[in-house]
Structures are given as C-alpha cells and as structure tokens.
Curated annotation (Swiss-Prot):
PANTHER family: CDC45-RELATED PROTEIN (PTHR10507), CELL DIVISION CONTROL PROTEIN 45 HOMOLOG (PTHR10507:SF0). Residues 141-235, 301-328 are annotated as: Disordered. It holds the Pfam family CDC45. It comes from the Eukaryota. Residues 144-205 have a biased composition (Acidic residues). One of its GO terms (molecular function) is DNA replication origin binding. It is found in: Nucleus. The keyword Zinc does not apply. One of its GO terms (cellular component) is DNA replication preinitiation complex. InterPro entries: CDC45. The gene is cdc45. This is Cell division control protein 45 homolog. Belongs to the CDC45 family. The keyword GTP-binding does not apply.
Amino acid sequence: MVLTTDTKFSEIYDIIKGDSVQGESVLILVARDCDSIAACKILTEILKSDLIAYNIKAVSGYEDLENVNSTLLENEEIKSIIMINCGGNIDITNVFTNLNDQQVAYIIDSHRPYSINNITNESSVLIIDDGTYIEQDELQQLSDDSEEEEEELEEEEAEEDVVEDEAEEAEEAEEAEEAEEAEFDPENEDNPENDEDDGGSENIDENERKSKKKNKKDKKSKRKHRKKKKKKSEKLEKTYYGKSAAVSMYSLSTFLNKQNLDDLLWYAVLGLTDQFIHEKITLDSYEQQYKNFKELILNNYPTDGDDDQEERYRPGNDEDDYDENGDLKRHPSSMFLHGDKIIPSDDFRFMLYRHWNLYESLFNSRYVACKLRVWKAKGRFQLESLFAMMGIPLDQVKQKYNSMNVHYKKQLKQLLAINGPKFGLVNLYFNSFLKKYSNNSEISASDTVYAVTALMESDNLESDQSDQDIWEQNFWEAYDSISNKNIDLLKIGLKQSIQLQKEITRQVTSMIEKRSVILSGPFRYAFITESSDLKYFIHPLALTKLGLFMMDAFISMGKAKRPFLIGALNENKNSYLIVGISGSHSTDIQSNTFGEYFRKSAEYTDATFKYQSFDTSIVEVSKTDLHKFVEHLHGTMQTTQISK
C-alpha cells in the first residue's frame, strides 16, 4: 500500500520503535548514490536518538537484494526492512520470498513509477510516499481530461471526415449527373440496351461507393484506436524520479519533531543537489525545492535582523566578504552561532573551481565546454579570449584557485557577468548552498556531491579484493565522508572527482575527433573499448556523466536532439555496462524510455542481461550478445518512432 500522511508515519515509527525492544530489529538497505547515503544518515540519526539498534547493508542491484533474501532475512530479530532508493519499482515479494509474517519492508524510493504489486500489497510492503502518488492520481484525472480533449479532437476530425465525405458525395453526384446527362444524350436515346446497362451499372456503382466509405471509416477508427492505445502504453513505459529520498526523509523527521538533530538539513540539501547534478529532476522542480530549503535555512540560521542573508553570501557580492587570502569571511552577525552553518549561495556552473584552477574548471565543465566547443582549437582560443577580456592573466587562472590574486577572485562574478554572454555563457550560476564549518572552511553542496560520488565509484586496482568488497569499502568511505569529522576523506573524493572530469572531457574530445559516435536512426551510440580508458567508465554514474556530456556536445554542434546510448567494456566480466539517456536539462526531457526497450530487446534476443543498478536504464549485457542486442534495440525504437 502507499503511505502519504504524517499521522500514519508517526504510527509506523512507533511500531518500529516498539519492535526494537527485542534487539537489532531494523535492517537498512541503501543504494549506492549520494542521495541514498544522505537519506540513510538522516534515518540513522533519528534511530540513534531513540536508541534503536540497526544494521546497514549497501546494495548495488537486484542480485544484492537476492543475497539479502537468502541470508539476512533469516534473522528472526529483524522486524523492519527499510529500503532506500532500492525497492519502489520492483515487486518486493518476488525478491524477498523469505519475508515472514512479522516482517515488513518499508520503501523510501525516488524511482518512478512504483511497482503496482507494491502498491496493492496489504501486508508486507509499505511505500512511504513523497506525495507524488497522490499527484499521479491527479495526473490520471488530467489524463482523463486529456482523453476527453482527445475525443473532442476526434469528433472534430470526424466532422472533417464528414465534410470530406460530403465533398466526395458531391463529386460522385456530379459524376452521376454527368452520367445521367450522357444517358439522355440524343444519340443514345434510341438505344434501349443502353438504358438497361446504365441502370445495372448505377446499382453496382452505388454499392461500391457504400463499401468504400465503410472501409474508409473502419480504417480511420482502427488507426485512432491504435494511437490511443499506444499513448497509454508510452505513459506506463517511461521512468522518472520523484523527490530525493533524503528530502523525503527530512520531511518525515519533521513529523517526528526531530528535524533539529545534527546535520539533517544539510543531508537533505545534498540529496536534492545530487538529483540536480545528475539531472534526475527538472530545473523547475529543483528551483521550487531550493526555495523551500532556503526558507528553512534562513529560519534555522538567523542573521541578526538581516532579512536577506542570501545576498550577503553570494560569492563575490561584496569585497568586504573576503579576507586577505580571498576566502569568504564569516559575517559578524553570525558570530553568535556556534558550530557549522548552511548558507544560501549562487554556485558557478563550472565545477570544483575552489579545489582546482579556474582554467581547467571551465575547460572541463560540461556547460562551458559545450558552449565554447573546447575540443576544437577555436574553442580553446575562445576560452583564453574570455579570460583576456576579463583582464585575468593566464598564469593566474592556471594556478590553484586558492593561490589566485585576491583582486581577481573578488571581481570574478562581476567580470563573468559582463563578458560571459559575449561567448554564449548566459547561465553561469545556479541557486545552491554552502556549508561553513566552525573552523571557517567551507564546501559547496555540489562539490560535496561530486566528492561523495567519486569516492563511491573509485577503483583500487592494486587491491586483491573482489569487486564486491571494493565497492562496499567505497560505500563506507563515501558514507563517512559527509560526516563533519572526516573532511580529509572529502578532500580525497574531490581529487578523484577532478581526475574523473578530466578523463570525461578527454574521452569526449577523442570520440568527436575519431568519429566514434554512430547515428542509429532514433538514437546515437558509442562504446569504450580501449583498456586505458575503461577503469574510469565501468561505473554507472561516471558513464552517465560521459553520456550527458556527449549528448550536449552534439547539440552544441547543431545536431538534432536524440537519445544517447553509451557503453564501456568490463574486461573482467567480459560484458558491457550500458547507460541509456533520453534527455538532459538542455533538452528539457527528464523521463527515460530506455528501460522498457532494454527489457524487450533482452527478451527477444535472449541476451545475457542484468540490471546494474535500480535504474532500469542502466544494464549489463554480455560482450557476445552486444551486437544483436543493439540491433534489436534500433529496430524497436525505429518502429516506435515511425508509428508515432
């Protein structure tokens, strides 16, 4: 069933708390992304506040859930299984066959749509919804309204058909009149045989006209029925995301009056930022949620009567905001606040610049790189020209940002606002947040997400551990990194993220220069097979970043907007990791249809195939089956496109 009210959640939490008296009764299953980790952090803080024992198990896909079913669920002490971003879109009772009558799976998942079996299950599965299921009901009403409009359009089309039919009848009447005139031709008047033949011919023609008219109407009716059926089918096939699990979990904490526990608000901000960075939600959805969090943050961190805290903390907004090293200073009005605080702030759309240098940050950031087309000499010249017009020497922008002359750092935002539009860089900022630590150091929400994600998808090639052991170790490092006590771990993640982004840009340049991208009718695709490149891209989120970059690169070159299929060979498994991307923020498309096409192609070709995450648009296909899999995918999507 679906749970949507705070009252019911309070009741459910009381049940979880009551069961905890028996021992370690809560098992938390967590997917491998920053949003899931942030949501888990919120949940564990809540559980710890009530002295509820718990066990955390990281899961990367369906196989891990099956392993949980065959091992952990046999523990009779476990009463509650809380699933974060790892159960909403699959039938839980099919996977957790060992659930006993005393166990309940609680799902907090941003993946949409929900499995219908989870919704209808009345005993062992409960979805803690963010409100989007209600919205889906409302959307169903809108859909019904839309169908009414469609019926009205069909009626209009029918009226047009009537007009066409009347025109045809008029034409036929005219022909009949001409024939009648011919019958009364004086030359034919004396021929009785003509009268007989004409009369018989007239009856046959009339029957043919009626038959043709009926066939025509039947064809139109079938065509309209097929179109309507297809539209309904497409609505069910698309996957998309609801609110981040961390945002949902924070909302639930407010229902329990536990929202003031340490760092819960920051974890929620990270969950929202993760969805934005990885383009799982629309810009409009992000902006609306940003406003909500901004209000919460301003209420939690008052500024001594200053109603516009956000303006006071926009980077570069005021020279007095900087110290002698060019770093943002703590505002005097906040000195009475102890510990860390969150600050609403504009963030640049060139990534990690605080921990990098300006030149490489702009060069490797997708937005700037695609606008300037830095894979070409002209694009690189434009980037250098931008700095020249801003009056910042290259030796300044190519050194660590922290070492830059404070004067240039102070003027950066203003100079970009003036000169950026000359190069098509008109949207260089987005609304975000900074976390200011008690020691006066700071990190942005976006940089934190980049770092946590990089830690989770890093490789230890020198280790003798199995892939499973390595990624579980990575998960715990990522989990620990967002704690205030592990700033050093975050710094490692920042370095790894910078290295990954450089490799992504290099790979994009290489693919464009080598013409490695193939246009396959309804989509473009490319596969990475060179050993030196593979270690970076055998991870879902890293490969997704590359695919989004490639998609925007082609759009920037004036190519038609098309979905993108990106794959990387995993030599150890002799298989390809494949990510299907339907759209990005630049295409205004956030839903994804690849999941259903992948499933159909795998079934039809009998390919060795498995899901590599809980996102159905990320799969693993055997190397030997790749060609027939992609070939069928092309045929299926081509047929769908033609039939639209």
